[in-house]
From Swiss-Prot:
This is Ribosome maturation factor RimM. It is found in: Cytoplasm. GO terms for biological process: ribosomal small subunit biogenesis; rRNA processing. It comes from Halalkalibacterium halodurans (strain ATCC BAA-125 / DSM 18197 / FERM 7344 / JCM 9153 / C-125). NCBIfam families: 16S_RimM. The keyword RNA-binding does not apply. Belongs to the RimM family.
Length: 173
């Protein structure tokens, strides 16, 4: 059984010509949503994926608008509302050294170089120059915000699901 990656969520239809409004969850929109690419729609409350081929893609405000081959009207795509767009995990692109997919980082435990267990990564924010990993503290209290920079993140061990950090002054306060 194959594993799947979510690459977007269909939040609504757009117009009457079969376009769907997608909230993207991929960093590779130009590749994932290009004409001819196959995506799979996991409709709400369904256990089966529907294979669709992208006919066109364009940006509109903060959304991606997609049309699928063989779905020329709003009536054809109405059932996709609320569905997730997915691709098989084998379709993910290769990443460079020190680059990770969000799903690989979320859930990893975070420890200091001194061995103190801090918590688990629950979310990743992308505010600008670098990602920020949100760590849910083991001891309760406020979440920690860990910048993904060389000075702080010393090691990421995906096999052990563990991230080792060297906290900067004030980071753990």
């Amino acid at each position: 059984m194959s594993k799947w990656l979510n690459v977007g969520k269909i939040v609504n239809t757009h117009g009457v010509r079969g376009e769907v409004r997608v909230l993207s969850t991929t960093d590779f929109e130009d590749d994932r949503f290009s004409s001819g690419k196959t995506l799979y729609v996991m409709r709400p409350n369904q256990n089966e994926r529907v294979a669709v081929t992208v006919a066109s893609h364009r940006k509109h405000k903060n959304f991606d608008l997609l049309c699928f081959e063989g779905y020329p009207s709003i009536n054809d795509v109405e059932a996709f509302k609320g569905g997730r767009l997915q691709v098989p995990i084998e379709d993910r692109p290769e990443l460079g050294e020190g680059e990770f997919f969000y799903h690989e980082i979320i859930g990893c435990s975070v420890v200091t170089i001194a061995g103190e267990e801090l918590g688990k990564v629950k979310e990743i924010l992308s505010p600008g120059a670098n990602d920020v990993w949100v760590v849910q503290c083991r001891r309760g209290g406020k979440d920690l915000l860990i910048p993904y920079i060389e000075q702080v993140v010393k090691q990421v061990d995906l096999e052990k699901q563990q991230i080792t950090i060297e906290p900067m002054e004030g980071l753990l306060e």
